[in-house]
Amino acid sequence: MKQLQTALFISVIVASISAHAANPSNVFVGAWVVQDVVGYSDTSGGPPEAKRLLGKTMRIARDSIDFDGQRCQPSDGFTISTVDTAPKLLDYYQIRVTDAGLPQKTVLLDSASCAPIFRMDARRIVFGWDGVILRAIKQ
């Protein structure tokens, strides 16, 4: 009986660890340093604004995003979903997947009030800020 209890306990622990690792919200949480500029719109600050943002750190927590001295904390929380990248990228930033270097399907961190963030891969994200589209790497 004791062996069965031990086996059951271990199974529950392994299952909970696996479920926690598979939680997509964890892929965004952390510090991300802006490495390069994907593009910018006519309404942005142009190259000077883009250069100013290089090297800045975005901090993503479970319930907030901090970047460039501003905090965004959506009252309704974040939505995390796997999306077809092309239509979402065009809708949010008016750029093509090939310009951003994103995969055809990706994970999107979204909310009603914060900048949408696309997961490029395990260590890179793409997001827009004041009309500048940026790529950042996990610190």
Regions found by a protein language model. Give the residues of each.
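Positively charged n-region of N-terminal signal peptides that target proteins for export
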Residues: 1-5
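Bacterial N-terminal signal peptides
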Residues: 7-16
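Sec/Tat signal peptide C-region and signal peptidase I cleavage site
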Residues: 17-21
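Short, hydrophobic/aromatic-rich segments at coil-to-beta transitions
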Residues: 30, 101-108, 122-125
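Short hydrophobic/aromatic-rich beta-strand segments that constitute the beta-sheet cores
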Residues: 34, 65-68, 125-128
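Contiguous, well-ordered beta-strand patches that form the walls/edges
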Residues: 38-40, 60-115
